[in-house]
Structures are given as C-alpha cells and as structure tokens.
Amino acid sequence: MDTYTFRSPYSKFVLATTVIIMVLMHGAFMACMGGMVRSDFGSGAFFTNLLIFAACVFVVLYAFCIQIRKVTLNDTTLIIHRQIGKVRIPLNTITKVETKDEIGLDLRLWGISFFFGHYGLFYNRTLGKYRAYVKNSDQMLVVHTSNRTHVFSCERRDELLTLLQQRMS
C-alpha cells in the first residue's frame, strides 16, 4: 500500500498577511486589556472590552486550528490533515478532480481569508458551495464528491492530480 504525502506550505503573500494581522491582533489584545484595567469591573465598558478580547482570541485559535498541514493519499482515501482534525475523502466517492486558479473573489459564507490562509465555507458560481483549506492559491486542487466539494492547496499539485485521476479510472 503506497502512501503519498504532500506538504502544504504558506505562500509568501499569505505568510506576510498573517504576520500583519497577528501584529494588529496583538494591538487589539493590548487595547482591550488596557480598557478592562481602566474600567470598573462589571461596567459596560469592561464587558465590551472583554467581549472584543474573547472574539479576537476565538478568531486566532479557530484560524490556526483549521489550517491545512498536509495532504496524504493512500489506496483508499485522500486525507486533508489540519492542525486539529482530519478530513477524510474516500476515493470511491470522488466524482471529479480539477485545478482552481482564483479564490480571492469567491464569496465567504463562513470563512476566513489571508489569516493563516483561506478556510471555511465559500461559494462561487462555477463550483457552488465548497469547503476551502488553502495556504497557497497558486497550488489549488478541487475534489468533487457526490455531496460536497473540497478545495485545498499542496505542493506538487499536478502530481497529486495525476495520481487521483489514475485511481478514479
């Protein structure tokens, strides 16, 4: 049983935007903590700052935890490894595999872009609703199943595309 592994590194653009957003988030954390220290416990200002702080922490943790690390392909399954959890796609459910060139203009239904990559539920007219796990938009692959569409990025995308097409036939 052969297992192929394809890493999923950041593009330079996504890495730069992630660093910039983390610096801005750090500023938001510090401003909220300063606001909580300066306001009376239990006041509206205290709870507003606490809510903003909690929302910022949630966004950072959520974006970090769902980012793609690598993709593996074995004889029966394509697996998208995230920081926490895996997405398993049985090869016998795959109906079509193709490349994708652009994600920047797609509608985010419940997704994050440019912060650790592009993740979540997206929509465009060609694909409809799809789940995105993308760190590098130059290396995107689309996998269609009977009930869901996945878009992800990995190194050696064309090699993975060829392997998937061979196993589908």
Positions of PLM-derived features:
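Loop-to-helix transition at the N-terminal end of transmembrane alpha-helices
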Residues: 41-59
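Non-transmembrane, membrane-adjacent beta-strand/coil modules in membrane-associated proteins
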Residues: 2-5, 81-146
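N-terminal membrane-targeting/pre-transmembrane regions
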Residues: 1-45, 142, 146-149
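Short, surface-exposed linear segments at secondary-structure transitions and domain or protein termini
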Residues: 14, 97-103, 158-167
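Conserved beta-hairpin
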Residues: 57-98
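Terminal membrane-proximal soluble interaction domains of membrane-associated proteins
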Residues: 137-165
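Short amphipathic alpha-helical segments, especially helix-boundary/capping motifs
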Residues: 34-36, 51-55, 68-71, 116-117, ...
